[in-house]
Amino acid sequence: MLAQVNASAAVVLRNQHHAILITIAVTTLAAALGLVFALLVSGGITRPVRLLLEGTRQVEAGYLDQPIDVITGDEIGQLTAAFNRMVEQLRHKERIRETFGRYVDPRVVEALIDQPKLAAVEGQRRVMTVMFCDMKGFTNLSAGMTPQGLVKVMNLYLSTMSEPIRRHRGVIDKYIGDAIMAYWGPPFVEEADEAQFACVAAIEIIERLAKLRGELTELLGLRVMPAEVDLRIGIATGEALVGSIGSDIMMNYTVMGDTVNLAARLEAANKLYGSRALTADATVAKTDGTIQFREVDRLRVVGQTQSQAIFELMGRKGELTPAQSLLCARYAEGLTAYRERRWEQARGAFAAALEAVPGDGPATTLVKRIDYLQQSPPGPDWDGAWRLEAK
């Protein structure tokens, strides 16, 4: 009897142990399956979130070309799709900005976007420096060209001459045929620097002329570039109206006023003096002393009642040749005598200037003017100024 009881107890213990093992195995399996399921579920949630976070970082860094894959249909998937649509809109706006940056100076585009108050139609009065640059002899050069050839020549010329303006922080306002209008001033350049930047840009434009003539000769298939192909530059500094100017349907952020007109008149005055780059005393006064100028005359331009001293940009100070330095000295002597009506002394000084640099335009012009004034003497109130009749 006792043996049977012991045997039954042993069976019960074995069954109990077996049941415990089965329970442990089932529990372990369930836990493992639960863990795997939890990992799968959490991965399905966190992976889209990680992708979205990485996409946000890419956009913040300026990379807008890679959309995020939408891998779920839940709220995170909807958020990802909305994010992709936002990035596409940003890409579209960036394309617009890049496109218009080729038609309007990129800094103007950026300023109008970032500072909406600049688009106000009232405008502001600021001291600005304005440049006009024109190609002399372009009309004759372009005669007989095909439209395609003319476009190539224009693009080469405008690209070559625009680069120094941009590099020295000028804003190209517009192209007017073969002429360039540019300006320097707030908010793009500090007022204290604008005249210096404009004059340095003008010097570099003149330095590029020889290279441009060579490239045009090759482009047009000419043996020699016509001598009349040259540059005329006018620079003026003074108060101007700055702002968005135009109609209800089209606006232009530009500068207007007497300073702009003076720059245009000085560019045209190069025809009278046979010079390349003329500026006025207000511009000279705001440069830093590293540029060599030569006072050419006193001029009263169309639209202004007061005369002002005009100067030719000769180059960087210290880089003039001995002949150019002698030219400046003799010309200054002649100009002093000319204003004091000492005609023969003035003629002699200008002749000495022409010996230093034969064919110098301003000296040639003043010698001819002395001939005229000796035949038609000026009145007693003459201040030495010449009136520029033509625009």
Predicted features along the sequence, with ranges:
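Catalytic NTP-binding/metal-coordinating core of nucleotidyl cyclase/transferase enzymes
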Residues: 119-201, 253
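HAMP exit helix and analogous amphipathic coiled-coil linker helices
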Residues: 2, 76, 85-101
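Membrane-proximal coiled-coil signaling linkers
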Residues: 91-125
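Alpha-helical scaffold within the catalytic cores of cyclic-nucleotide enzymes
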Residues: 154-170, 186, 190-233, 258-271, ...
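Cytosolic regulatory/linker segments at or just downstream of nucleotide-handling modules
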Residues: 240, 269-345, 351-353, 357-379
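Membrane-proximal alpha-helical signal-transduction linkers
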Residues: 44-66, 71, 80-82, 87
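Juxtamembrane amphipathic/coiled-coil helical coupling segments that flank
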Residues: 1-23
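Cytosolic-side ends of inner-membrane transmembrane helices, especially those
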Residues: 26-46, 60
